[in-house]
Amino acid sequence: MADLSAQDKLKQICDALREETLKPAEEEAGSIVHNAREQAKRIVEEAKEEAQRIIRSAEETADQTLKKGEAALVQAGKRSLENLKQAVETKIFRESLGEWLDHVATDPEVSAKLVQALVQAVDAQGISGNLSAYIGKHVSARAVNEALGKEITSKLKEKGVSVGKFSGGAQLKVEERNWVLDMSSEVLLDLLTRFLQKDFREMIFQSC
């Protein structure tokens, strides 16, 4: 019985020690587990929020990129349309106008009228001096002189027109003043292009 009593006492002592040491440890462990769970929950929530933020940022970036891409496409489309307009103007408008001028400005009657208009313009301004008239290299000087008549050719230094190096049209030089009044086909093409280009664009590209 004494041994049992000793064992009982030993058990009581062990139980007491366990009660004193293990219970607080269990409570501490429980608190640690609880805190860990709360912290894990908070971390998960923060991770979810961060993930949502990243997704929103990615969506915004993608949307901005898409808008920039759309804007770039629109701008590229506008540039392509403008390039097309310029190509059409060059091919249809300027080249066709140039061909028409080459035909018209090499007509002796037209060349004569241009020379006459230039001489009369100089006279109207009271400008005197030696006048030299030049016509296109593809035009007959004899035919132009006949169309002008003596009233105009008599005012020219050479008593008639000379053949120039340009295609068609006419030029008048006032030698003392070193002036050149230029109505050659090249100059006429530039003048007509500037005057008619707007009307041509509106007519051809009004729906663009």
Curated annotation (Swiss-Prot):
Domain of life: Bacteria
GO MF annotation list: ATP binding; proton-transporting ATP synthase activity, rotational mechanism; proton-transporting ATPase activity, rotational mechanism
InterPro entries on file: ATP_synth_B-like_membr_sf, ATPase_V1_Esu, T3SS_HrpE/ATPase_suE
GO terms under cellular component: proton-transporting two-sector ATPase complex, catalytic domain
An annotated GO BP: proton motive force-driven plasma membrane ATP synthesis
Signal peptide segment: none
SUPFAM superfamilies noted in UniProt: F1F0 ATP synthase subunit B, membrane domain
Keywords: ATP synthesis, Hydrogen ion transport, Ion transport, Transport
Family: Belongs to the V-ATPase E subunit family.
Functional description taken from the UniProt entry: Produces ATP from ADP in the presence of a proton gradient across the membrane.
Protein name (Swiss-Prot/TrEMBL): V-type proton ATPase subunit E
Gene encoding the protein: atpE
